[in-house]
Amino acid sequence: MTNVLDVPERRDRGPAIGPDPRAAAAHVAAGGSPLDLVRAPDWFSYSTLDTFERCPRQYAFRYLCRLPAEQARPAATFGSAAHAAFEAFTRDRRQRSTRGEQPPGRVDLERWFESAWAATSLPAEPEAETWRRRAEPMLDGFWAAESAVHFDTFGEELRFRLRLPLDPETLVVVSGFIDRIDRLPSGTVELIDYKTGQACAPDEAESSLQLSIYALACRDSLGLGRPERATLYFVEQDRRVSVVRTDAALDTVRTDLAARARQIRGSDFAPTPSPRSCGWCDFAALCPINALAAGSPADQTRGAGLDCRDGDSISRWPALPTPL
């Protein structure tokens, strides 16, 4: 079996629809199905499943037409930089430990965060700087918590692939990355997903599909057995919210994932408008619903004259990269 630590650390982007995402977007915006242009998807992740549940049309634009997000948002950039810093810190600590060296210091943690933040395309603006200042207390709290207790970290950014047969001829894959897995004194493991922002209530963690998928991956893909606990680590509050997934619960998750995959593969990708799904949708200007939250980035794009009902709007959509 391949060592999961040796798998290249690359975020999956999903299947490419073809050489011209704009043409695909125009086809979908005009009421056509993306499945007219590409085979039914056989690759899924927690993010794709969550996006489809929020709005099937948004899923089609992002993951089938492969349209990029309009712009980097400070909240997402902050979270990405934090994840990169924590990953670098625990990896370096683990590697130093095998060499009998002292663990990295607080200055190293900040250096990794600054490097990740500088690598983003976020414009220099007051809102971005406000987010940047939030890093200091977060890094202080993470450093203090990680220094107070010995953690035996198995690995970081662990890639998994769950293979799910839908029928004798159809196999789909649910893949992703687990932020961190620690070994526990009991001989089992704890999986950890870092979160920035406000901590959730215990019942929200209990119903988390993301934690269920990751726990299933620990057992069925990574060969680590059922984790003793699955944890959301809210780093800005230094709070951990943990849940337990039984084997029976994980078996149910497998069945549920297969059902979700079938639903997506048979979908017409009709939009499901709501303030949550439309207010910050990068593709609202291409959607016929126009149920947009006032003042949202989507409204600004529509104000610039981009509308799915106008064929010229599609051609004026920003230049798109070639799909991976």
Please provide the spans of the model-predicted regions.
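A non-catalytic, helix-rich entry segment at domain boundaries
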Residues: A84-L164, P323
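Short, polar/flexible loop-turn hinges at active-site or ligand-entry regions and domain interfaces
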Residues: L67-A75, R93-G100, A124-E125, A201, ...
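Hydrophobic (often cysteine-bearing) scaffold residues that line and stabilize catalytic clefts
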Residues: P74, F78, A82, W131, ...
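Mg2+/Mn2+-dependent nuclease catalytic core
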Residues: L158-T255
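Short cysteine clusters
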Residues: C55, C278-C281, C287
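Short cysteine/histidine-rich zinc-coordinating motifs and their immediately flanking basic loops
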Residues: N290-Q300
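C-terminal, charged and often intrinsically disordered regions of DNA end-processing helicases
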Residues: M1-T77, P297, G303-L324
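Polybasic (Lys/Arg-rich)
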Residues: A249-D282
